[in-house]
Amino acid sequence: MKNRIKLFLVISALSLLFGMKANAQVFDGITQPTKFRVWVPVSIDLHNSKNVGVAPFVGYKQDIGERFSITPVLQYNINKEAFVPQVWLNFNVAKKFYILSRSIYDTKADLYKHTLSATYKLPLGFMVDGTWENMYNGKKFCDGDRLQFVGGWAHRLFVVNAGYSCRAKPGFIANFRWKVTPNDWLQMKYDGGTKSMQLGCALQFN
């Protein structure tokens, strides 16, 4: 537990040392194994290293039977100085196929957004993922939305994913996650569509 706290404090301190101008999107948690998750993402604009976004969040997952769970999430966008409450609804079939629906409300912009994700776990640690980001952008459906498709492989200590994002801001996307413990991890994500890099830390516990 002490190592988890130290890891979280180090990442949080680094986050606050960066400049704070860009937005940060979060697309992790579809297979969250624990009740609590603290996630600290730091997004860096590759064209302007001073353009950095920090938007940490905490979520609590409540299982409703074996196939369904609901996770209230509270996120704070440091750049906008705005709270972003969310509700995540997760449905799974035999712990192999997952669907995650995210309802997101930006309190400062007074906008409701919606994102839909799915993951299918294949044998030998392989997986395929899809995300429909901003399928509803607060004003219209399918306006400025992004479709992302990736394939990946999970090992005991790491997970790698790579794929492509189309429609708005198309480009190659890749993700590398290193498991510090079975439930806690560090992550690096590249998004060729937004020309950004994201570094993050997740702490998960019951």
Report each predicted region and the residues it spans.
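Glycine- and aromatic-enriched membrane insertion/assembly motifs of diderm outer-membrane
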Residues: 51-99
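Bacterial N-terminal signal peptides that target proteins for export
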Residues: 1-9
